[in-house]
């Protein structure tokens, strides 16, 4: 039986339509070259179906990625959720509309214990840009983390609204934690009601909501870190680096 990693490689080779990456960027309002290149490099285009490839259908079925004869994440952007050692726990798929995300159920995966992108964050935190050494940025959404990752920022996603004690303990691997919850009621609870059980010296950064007007009938709303990156790109370093250097516990608001 093939490993999940081997089957994922087959998915990338046979099912991911890289010609759709530009459409993914358009739907997510990504305009900067860094994130566009990142999407291509990581095969973040929309998935097709293996309907004429019996061998591929069989291996997909072996790992639980086949549903009624078709790839479970057909029509979605396929993103692997990995363990801290880099091995694949399961796959999650994104598309515009409802439901936006669909995670393939797997005995090796639980939102209660897994951080999204932890493997890359550990590598970037201790082997990447020295400005971020020993630090990590905690966000809610998968694409928040991926967008930061594209700019070399060690970032992990909760994949939900809470950070329980187990996941909070994992954060002790880092010297400095910067929490960036979404700007909504759930995100506000992360600080006000302490829904995120994070180290005591963690910094909370809130992105102030603002709508930008670009000429007649064209506007862009910034309400989370993904939106901020879509508009301002590499300027994110000007925001995060000073917070990394401050080892105390603070609350900051990113006023645009």
Question: What are the functions of these language-model segments?
Answer:
Residues 1-78, 82-85, 127-131, 243-256:
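TOPRIM metal-binding catalytic domain and adjacent DNA-binding surface shared by DnaG-type primases
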Residues 2-9, 141-144, 197:
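Short charge-dense sequence patches
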Residues 8-11, 30, 101-102, 174, ...:
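Aromatic side chains
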Residues 23-30, 103-126, 212-231:
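Short, exposed beta-strand "edge-strand" segments with a Pro/Gly-rich flavor and a Y/T-containing core
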Residues 25, 89, 100, 132-136, ...:
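TOPRIM fold recognition
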Residues 50-175, 190-191:
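Phosphate-handling DNA/RNA-contact segment within nucleic-acid enzymes
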């Amino acid at each position: 039986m093939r490993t999940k990693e081997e089957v994922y490689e087959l998915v990338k080779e046979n099912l991911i339509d890289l010609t759709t990456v530009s459409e993914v960027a358009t739907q997510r309002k990504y305009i900067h070259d860094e994130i566009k290149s990142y999407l291509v490099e990581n095969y973040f285009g929309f998935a097709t179906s293996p309907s004429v490839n019996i061998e591929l259908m069989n291996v997909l079925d072996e790992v639980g990625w086949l549903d009624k004869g078709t790839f479970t994440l057909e029509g979605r952007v396929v993103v692997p959720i990995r363990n801290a050692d880099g091995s694949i726990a399961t796959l999650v798929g994104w598309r515009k509309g409802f439901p936006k995300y669909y995670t393939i159920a797997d005995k090796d995966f639980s939102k209660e214990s897994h951080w999204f992108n932890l493997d890359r964050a550990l590598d970037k935190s201790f082997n990447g840009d020295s400005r971020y050494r020993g630090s990590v940025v905690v966000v809610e959404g998968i694409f928040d983390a991926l967008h930061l990752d594209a700019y070399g920022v060690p970032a992990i996603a909760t994949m939900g609204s809470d950070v329980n004690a187990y996941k909070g303990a994992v954060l002790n691997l880092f010297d400095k934690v910067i929490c960036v919850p979404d700007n909504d009621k759930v995100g506000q609870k992360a600080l006000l009601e302490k829904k995120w059980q994070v180290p005591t010296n963690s910094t909370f950064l809130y992105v102030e909501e603002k709508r930008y007007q670009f000429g007649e009938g064209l506007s862009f709303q910034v309400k989370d870190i993904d939106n901020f990156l879509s508009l301002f790109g590499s300027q994110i370093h000007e925001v995060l680096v000073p917070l990394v250097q401050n080892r105390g516990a603070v609350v900051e608001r990113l006023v645009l």
